[in-house]
From Swiss-Prot:
GO MF assignments: magnesium ion binding; mannosyl-3-phosphoglycerate phosphatase activity
Signal peptide (residue range): none
EC code: 3.1.3.70
Subcellular location: Cytoplasm
The name this protein goes by in its record: Mannosyl-3-phosphoglycerate phosphatase
EC category name: hydrolase
Cofactor annotation: Mg(2+)
HAMAP family found in the cross-reference section: MPGP_rel
An example Gene Ontology CC term for this record: cytosol
Length: 271
């Protein structure tokens, strides 16, 4: 067990973890967010969402000014005080959103794979798919280094699609509800390691890390954490880690923000 007093970074997924998958409510986690804020412990949001979406949510959660990881690690939004770092305010890994769109359109036209991207529809349709407001749905379309899509083809064709993407230096990642295409060099783990190294360089000491997530695309993040909370989720595949030592990994009984709170309660029991 470790202490809330020691240098610590908390990395958290959003949908299905800190936010309820259906209502987007986060109130069960609010007391812990306040406690971490009072202890000057950064809560670093890490999601498949766009940086525009996440900056809005970051402000809503009272976490503004902190770094965040967007688009499954393809985009790192730097902390406000990191203005001297090259690339400020955002670091983007791999090829751009526009370049990925070109690849996908070519594959769809020439090899007849069936899928619908967020670029194929308007914000009203995305609002129906997600339950977001129109204004929030519009933020989901502001990708910089990935493409979000709904797969509408067979499992056999998906395997062929993934192989073609890999040949082209891209990866296909499953989220809680949607699929994401991004550069093969990008990932939540690489982005988290970069942020950890930056905090270490600035403070002179490596912080202890705790990660929370509920979906398969959170596994790379949780693998590089010192401690991990696997929040009970909706995805049938779940999250599986190479090292699930109970001293390091806790699987919650509750879902969403209640599971988030349960995970923090587990690793920081009341004194």
């Amino acid at each position: 067990m470790f202490s809330i007093q020691q240098p610590l970074l908390v990395f958290s997924d959003l949908d299905g973890t800190l936010l309820d998958s259906h209502s987007y409510d986060w109130q069960p986690a609010a007391p812990w967010l306040s406690r971490l804020h009072e202890a000057n412990i950064p809560v670093i949001l890490c999601s498949s969402k766009t940086s525009a979406e996440m900056l809005y949510l970051q402000k809503m959660l009272g976490l503004q000014g902190l770094p965040l990881i967007a688009e499954n690690g393809a985009v790192i939004q730097l902390a406000e005080q990191w203005q001297d770092i090259d690339g400020f305010p955002r670091i983007i890994s791999g090829i751009s959103h526009g370049e990925i769109c070109q690849v996908l359109n070519t594959l769809r036209e020439k090899e007849h794979f069936k899928f619908t991207t967020f670029d194929d529809v308007d914000d009203a349709t995305i609002a129906e798919w997600t339950g977001l407001s129109r204004s929030q749905a519009a933020l989901t379309q502001l990708h910089e280094a990935s493409v979000t899509l709904i797969w509408r083809d067979s499992d056999e064709h998906m395997a062929q699609f993934i192989a073609r993407l890999n040949e082209l230096g891209l990866q296909f990642m499953q989220g809680a509800r949607f699929w994401h295409v991004l550069d093969a060099s990008a990932g939540k783990d690489q982005a988290a390691n970069w942020i950890i190294a930056t905090y270490q360089q600035l403070s002179g000491r490596r912080p202890t890390t705790l990660g929370l997530g509920d979906g398969p695309n959170d596994a790379p993040l949780l693998e590089v954490m010192d401690y991990a909370v696997i929040v009970k989720g909706l995805n049938r595949e779940g999250v599986h880690l190479h090292d699930e030592d109970p001293a390091r990994v806790w699987r919650t009984q509750r879902e969403g923000p209640e599971g988030w709170r349960e995970g923090l309660d587990h690793f920081f029991p009341a004194r």
